[in-house]
Amino acid sequence: MRIMVMDGQGGGVGRSLLEALKERFPEAELIAVGTNATATANMMKSGVTSGATGENAVVYNSKRADVIMGPMGIVMADAMLGEITPTMATAVASGDAKLVLIPTVSYTHLRAHETLSDLV
């Protein structure tokens, strides 16, 4: 199984995912794909052997992955302070890979008793 973990910014979410995946699925091919060099470098510290950076790396590896994991923003154009390009978001969201999207603090700031309609 080929699992692509994608992250941007500092790559902390991706690194945590890769560390857990490496322990849980040692036979899986894990690929770290960052939107920037810092994110990729941090994810590579998890001990994976394959990593790539940038828009073309996202497009190329999205087509070949069985599973794509990362923060929710990887399927939203202009997310992560603009690091996710429309091309990246489309490549991740429209492929055949199963998606595992992790909600992050910026997407989970609602209090327990609030709903989205309370904010609108």
Predicted regions and their residues:
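A short helix->loop->beta-strand "cap" motif at the edges of active sites that frequently abuts
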Residues: 28, 94-99
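Conserved small/polar residues in nucleotide/adenosyl-binding loops
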Residues: 108-115
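Glycine-rich phosphate-binding loop
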Residues: 50-88
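N-terminal/domain-start segments enriched in small and hydrophobic, helix-friendly residues
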Residues: 1-6, 117
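Glycine-rich phosphate/diphosphate-binding loop of Rossmann-like nucleotide-binding domains
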Residues: 4-34
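N-terminal beta-loop-helix "entrance" segment that forms/cooperates
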Residues: 31-52
